[in-house]
């Protein structure tokens, strides 16, 4: 008997990853499905001020998916990731100063990485969020500065990539999906896509 990709039923769709993130593109390709990358046409990432911090990523993922209208035969995947340290939301740093400030906040402490994901077809939109808890060792000023100068983490929530040098030397523990910290919780996404019959 010849085995087939468990997601082969998705071949009836034209799949769009509506994200400019090279990491999400890399991660989605690990599921073995054909897709195209077309970033969502969303100019801002505003959310209602009363939105609980844990709900922000899923709200933004749904907002991005709602802005995408490619036709009935498309399946759209959007995502948004935030880092929450205490009750403070850390998005993408705008400059080196912000990146260093974020790394100082994370240094020697625990934080949460939350990724919201939306999957949209012509008939419906499904969404979820995944939470991963990450523990960081204390970082020296030189370690933080060298990382920011060398890796320029301005496209990463919380100013770090767990798969990069800072993750190797700084992350002491993780509870939850590693891929979620990179920007796409693959197991949860696979489960949702598997159920799209």
Put a short name on every predicted segment.
Residues 2-12, 50-197:
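Anionic-ligand binding patches
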Residues 3-33:
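N-terminal beta1-alpha1 ligand-phosphate binding loop
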Residues 20, 40, 122:
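Cofactor-binding loop segments of dinucleotide-utilizing enzymes, especially the Rossmann-like FAD-
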Residues 24, 44-46:
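Flexible, glycine-rich phosphate/dinucleotide-binding loops
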Residues 35-36, 81:
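Short, solvent-exposed secondary-structure junction/capping segments
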Residues 36-44:
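A short beta-strand-loop structural module common to alpha/beta enzyme folds
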């Amino acid at each position: 008997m010849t085995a087939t990709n468990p997601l082969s039923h998705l071949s009836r769709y034209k799949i769009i990853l509506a994200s400019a993130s090279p990491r999400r593109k890399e991660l989605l390709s690990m599921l073995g499905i054909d897709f195209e990358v077309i970033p969502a046409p969303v100019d801002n990432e505003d959310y209602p001020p009363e939105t609980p911090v844990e709900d922000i990523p899923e709200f933004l993922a749904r907002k991005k998916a709602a802005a995408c209208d490619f036709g009935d035969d498309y399946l759209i995947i959007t995502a948004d990731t935030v880092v929450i340290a205490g009750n403070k939301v850390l998005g993408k740093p705008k400059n080196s100063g912000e990146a260093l400030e974020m790394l100082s906040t994370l240094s020697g402490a625990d934080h949460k990485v939350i990724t919201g994901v939306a999957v949209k077809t012509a008939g419906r939109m499904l969404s979820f969020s995944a939470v991963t808890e990450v523990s960081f060792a204390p970082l020296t000023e030189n370690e933080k500065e060298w990382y920011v100068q060398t890796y320029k983490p301005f496209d990463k929530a919380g100013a770090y990539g767990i798969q990069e040098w800072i993750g190797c030397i700084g992350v002491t523990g993780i509870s939850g999906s590693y891929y979620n910290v990179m920007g796409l919780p693959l197991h949860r996404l696979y489960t949702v896509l598997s159920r799209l019959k």
